[in-house]
From Swiss-Prot:
Belongs to the ATPase B chain family. It is a single-pass membrane protein. F-type ATPases have 2 components, F(1) - the catalytic core - and F(0) - the membrane proton channel. F(1) has five subunits: alpha(3), beta(3), gamma(1), delta(1), epsilon(1). F(0) has three main subunits: a(1), b(2) and c(10-14). The alpha and beta chains form an alternating ring which encloses part of the gamma chain. F(1) is attached to F(0) by a central stalk formed by the gamma and epsilon chains, while a peripheral stalk is formed by the delta and b chains. F(1)F(0) ATP synthase produces ATP from ADP in the presence of a proton or sodium gradient. F-type ATPases consist of two structural domains, F(1) containing the extramembraneous catalytic core and F(0) containing the membrane proton channel, linked together by a central stalk and a peripheral stalk. During catalysis, ATP synthesis in the catalytic domain of F(1) is coupled via a rotary mechanism of the central stalk subunits to proton translocation. Component of the F(0) channel, it forms part of the peripheral stalk, linking F(1) to F(0). The gene is atpF. It comes from Thermosipho melanesiensis (strain DSM 12029 / CIP 104789 / BI429). This is ATP synthase subunit b.
Length: 161
């Protein structure tokens, strides 16, 4: 017997095997590989899309950080400006209050001076009147009319000086 003896059964089996391979390839393997290739392409597409989205997200994150820095700088600038304006307002109000206080003080001193002068005049006038009355009472009985008048005139002249 030969090792490679060919008989009809072997040929039919071999043909059946190749026919089965052809049918499997045509209906199963091709479809399977089409599905697998489509799935592979879809996965690769999703990976590329995810990578693109990640890059876009990183860019947006960088832009957001830049905007946040600009906003913080702007806010700091606004706060600094507001503090400076508030300080200026306070200083102006303080200066205005000091000027007003000085004005009131000068006015009060002037008023006190005027009142003092008025009181001095009034006191001098009353002193003169009282002196005349006292002199009249003292002299009532001791001097005659002419002497009284002369004495009163002398007192009034002294008082006016």
């Amino acid at each position: 017997m030969d090792m490679f003896e060919i008989n009809i059964t072997s040929v039919i089996q071999l043909m059946s095997f190749f026919l089965l391979l052809y049918i499997l390839k045509k209906f199963l393997y091709d479809k399977y590989f089409e599905v697998m290739d489509a799935r592979k392409e879809k996965i690769e597409g999703e990976i590329k899309k995810a990578e693109q989205l990640r890059k876009e997200a990183e860019e947006l994150k960088k832009e957001a950080k830049g905007e946040l820095i600009k906003i913080r700088e702007s806010a700091d600038s606004i706060i600094k400006k507001a503090k400076e304006e508030a300080e200026e307002i306070v200083n102006n109000a303080k200066k205005k209050a000091e000027a007003e206080a000085e004005k009131i003080l000068v006015s009060a001193k002037e008023e006190i001076k005027n009142e003092r002068e008025a009181m001095i005049k009034e006191v001098e006038q009353r002193v003169g009147e009282i002196a005349v009355v006292l002199a009249m009472k003292i002299l009532k009985g001791t001097l005659d009319e002419k002497a009284k008048r002369e004495y009163l005139m002398k007192i009034l002249k002294e008082h006016e000086k």
